[in-house]
Amino acid sequence: MRWVLAGLTALLLWLQGLLWFGEGGLNDVRGLSRSVEAQREEVDRLRQRNQALEAEVNDLKTGLEALEERARSELGMIREGETFYQIIEREDDAR
């Protein structure tokens, strides 16, 4: 009976060791939990970015002001009847 009890105790200790320190044990589970949390944060950040981009696309599709602003800043366009003045500073004046 003692040998059976000793064998079962040894088996229990071995299984506990696997649970705590083995592959797929609690350390791995903690690491995976941290990884999942980091990925959730990344997904939330990307969702917010997508929402901002979607709002910008909708604004460009429907709003003429945003379209005009982009045309002016990125393409250098001006309205009909406007005069464009570009002021260039001389190096002497820059000091």
Swiss-Prot record:
It is found in: Cell inner membrane. GO terms for cellular component: cell division site; cell septum; plasma membrane. Its main location: membrane. It comes from the Bacteria. It is a single-pass type II membrane protein. Residues 22-95 are periplasmic. The keyword Transmembrane helix applies. Residues 26-76 form a coiled coil. InterPro entries: Cell_div_FtsB, FtsL/DivIC. The chain crosses the membrane at residues 4-21. Keywords: Cell cycle, Cell division, Cell inner membrane, Cell membrane, Coiled coil, Membrane, Transmembrane, Transmembrane helix. Essential cell division protein. May link together the upstream cell division proteins, which are predominantly cytoplasmic, with the downstream cell division proteins, which are predominantly periplasmic. Part of a complex composed of FtsB, FtsL and FtsQ. PANTHER family: CELL DIVISION PROTEIN FTSB. This is Cell division protein FtsB.
